[in-house]
């Protein structure tokens, strides 16, 4: 287990931060922003809702050609700079370039906002123009969506001011949270030696085999978060206050309103899903209590929530995890395995834990080279192996869109649909492993890993939803102290985990380190994960029924997730996401795992 996991390689994109090509591309994007503004004024602004459909179609085609080229290069530059910032928050040059690029491309963002407002004004003319063949027709969904969302724009001057202030406001608070938490380390005694660990490594000790270590890590973590709770509370207040103010001036009902539109679902869908999730809490509490009993406890303290059970000594070297993933991906389709092998072989994955690197995991596309890059914090556990499979699923999703030659706008997938492939890949690996197990204790350990993940996505995500909802509501009246934020967090955990957890040992500081709370653009960065788990689980059930002929339809779905709303995309598989039954059927799959866990 001494093998050091790899760091990612992006030298096929740029050779480094001082690469002249990077500088040239950044300047090109800036220049294109100026050209786009001139095009908007001369070629778009004079057009009205009465403009001839053929002329409007021609101008829209021209617009799309300009936008796609700029978006592709800007997205690639952003991903490249993020590859440094997310793995080394001490890299001042990357931070400087990132800030510089954001400032210099702000005029282009303002122009894009003006174009969206213009689309809203000519909305009545769009159907006829978009019916004509060509790029505009192929981007009908994106253009129509932009026109409909234009009703929630402030005046041009107000939107420009909001955009420019965001760099020193909401986005600055977001960046501060990331910097403060990624640079935070904690001293903890392990095996008689005092070690200084980055916080993600400390958090990963929640899955340590020794309860004494887990408890010490939990106590250390709470103590360390308390030392920086004030600046993090300021970040939370700054972002939520900004979002509330902007939503009010944009005519939004609340922060959830924009989150639903960005997720491309409606409140009926959310209510159906969240209602069924709430109904499932007793089932998950049964799992929590069964787990507690294995430790001689009536209820779980937080430090045992992620504890391994069963035959837990199984650890994976990075190469073993790779082999496990590739073999099981191949059982689904050789194409998935070939994609994943390429990701491993070409060092698309940054898996090493180290100071300055952010916690958690993510996958980002690098469109200029039609590739993805994956960040995780590999610690040889089955959980982190499953995380790697999950993120490779995101990469395969990107691969399917690149294979279908989707443009930047066509690839803009909402969070709800973004988890489709990742959950599928996780499920493939889990089901393959569990089907081969003969030892009940090993089966228990694998079920445990899966149920920890399921309970996080259903129960903990519900607590995050309740937390964020109350924070937004109370932030309208006043700022919230760090103590108040912790109280709201504990209250949300009690409402969801219930008697499954020991109320004396909850985690009141979960709000400090989850980056999802600090995104100024995407609020309620939580319920889409539950949607993804349950939608992916439902799709896997369809795959089990249909077999190999499911694969082409599945790939077509992945290639199209940026080109329709969630209800229409789901309907192509006969799924009604506004009805409770689909969500109940997906949770019934999880309940079978809970039943088996309790039997063991």
PLM regions and their residue ranges:
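Short pre-active-site segment immediately N-terminal to the catalytic Zn-binding motif
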Residues: 313-318, 369-389
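Gly/Pro-rich turn-and-neighbor structural signature
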Residues: 301-359
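Active-site scaffold of zinc-dependent metalloenzymes
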Residues: 354-381, 398-399
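Active-site recognition of the HExxH zinc-binding catalytic motif
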Residues: 251, 379-399, 422, 427, ...
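C-terminal, non-catalytic "cap/extension" segments appended to globular domains
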Residues: 1-5, 11, 17-18, 130, ...
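A well-structured
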Residues: 1-311, 599
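Post-HExxH zinc-binding segment in Zn-dependent metallohydrolases
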Residues: 412-441, 450-452, 456, 532
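Post-HEXXH active-site segment of zinc metalloproteases
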Residues: 386, 398-423
């Amino acid at each position: 287990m001494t093998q050091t996991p790899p760091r990612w390689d992006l030298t096929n994109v740029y050779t480094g931060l001082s690469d002249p090509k990077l500088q040239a591309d950044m300047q090109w994007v800036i220049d294109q922003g100026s050209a786009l503004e001139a095009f908007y004024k001369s070629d778009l602004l004079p057009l009205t809702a009465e403009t001839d459909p053929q002329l409007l179609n021609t101008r829209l085609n021209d617009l799309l050609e300009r936008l796609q080229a700029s978006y592709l290069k800007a997205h690639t530059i952003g991903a490249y700079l993020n590859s440094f910032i997310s793995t080394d928050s001490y890299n001042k040059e990357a931070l400087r370039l990132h800030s510089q690029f954001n400032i210099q491309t702000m005029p282009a963002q303002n122009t894009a906002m003006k174009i969206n407002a213009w689309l809203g004004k000519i909305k009545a003319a769009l159907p006829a123009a978009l019916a004509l063949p060509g790029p505009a027709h192929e981007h009908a969904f994106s253009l129509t969506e932009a026109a409909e969302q234009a009703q929630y724009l402030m005046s041009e001057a107000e939107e420009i001011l909001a955009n420019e202030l965001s760099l020193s406001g909401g986005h600055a608070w977001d960046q501060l949270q990331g910097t403060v938490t990624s640079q935070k380390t904690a001293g903890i005694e392990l095996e008689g030696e005092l070690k200084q660990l980055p916080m993600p490594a400390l958090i990963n000790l929640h899955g340590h085999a020794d309860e004494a270590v887990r408890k010490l890590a939990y106590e250390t973590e709470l103590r360390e978060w308390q030392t920086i709770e004030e600046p993090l509370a300021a970040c939370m207040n700054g972002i939520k206050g900004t979002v509330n103010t902007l939503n009010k001036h944009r005519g939004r009902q609340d922060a959830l309103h924009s989150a639903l539109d960005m997720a491309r679902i409606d409140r009926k869908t959310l209510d159906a899903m969240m209602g069924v999730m709430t109904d499932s809490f007793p089932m998950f509490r049964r799992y929590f209590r069964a787990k507690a009993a294995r430790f001689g406890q009536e209820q779980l303290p937080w430090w045992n929530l992620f504890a391994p059970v069963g035959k837990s000594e199984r650890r994976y070297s990075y190469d073993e995890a790779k082999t496990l993933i590739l073999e099981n991906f191949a059982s689904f389709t050789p194409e998935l395995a070939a994609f994943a092998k390429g990701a491993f072989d070409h060092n698309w994955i940054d898996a090493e834990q180290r100071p300055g690197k952010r916690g958690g995991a993510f996958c980002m596309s690098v469109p200029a080279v039609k590739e993805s890059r994956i960040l995780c914090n590999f610690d040889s556990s089955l959980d982190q192996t499953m995380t790697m499979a999950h993120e490779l699923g995101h990469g395969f999703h990107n691969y399917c869109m690149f294979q279908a030659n989707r443009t930047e706008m066509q690839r803009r997938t909402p969070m709800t649909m973004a988890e489709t492939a990742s959950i599928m890949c996780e499920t493939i690996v889990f089901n393959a492993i569990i089907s081969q197990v003969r030892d009940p204790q090993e089966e228990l350990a694998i079920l445990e890993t899966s149920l920890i993940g399921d309970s996080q996505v259903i129960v903990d995500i519900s607590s995050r939803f309740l937390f964020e909802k109350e924070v937004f509501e109370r932030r309208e009246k006043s700022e919230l102290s760090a103590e108040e934020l912790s109280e709201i967090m504990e209250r949300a955990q009690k409402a969801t985990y219930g008697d499954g957890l020991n109320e004396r040992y909850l985690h009141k500081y979960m709000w400090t380190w989850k980056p999802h709370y600090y995104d100024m653009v995407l609020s309620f960065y939580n319920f889409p994960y539950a949607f993804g788990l349950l939608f992916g689980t439902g799709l896997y059930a369809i795959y089990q029924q249909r077999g190999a002929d499911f694969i082409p339809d599945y790939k077509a779905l992945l290639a199209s997730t940026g080109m329709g709303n969630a209800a229409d995309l789901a309907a192509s598989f006969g799924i009604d996401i506004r009805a409770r039954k689909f969500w109940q059927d997906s949770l019934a799959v999880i309940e079978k795992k809970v039943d088996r866990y309790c039997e063991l």
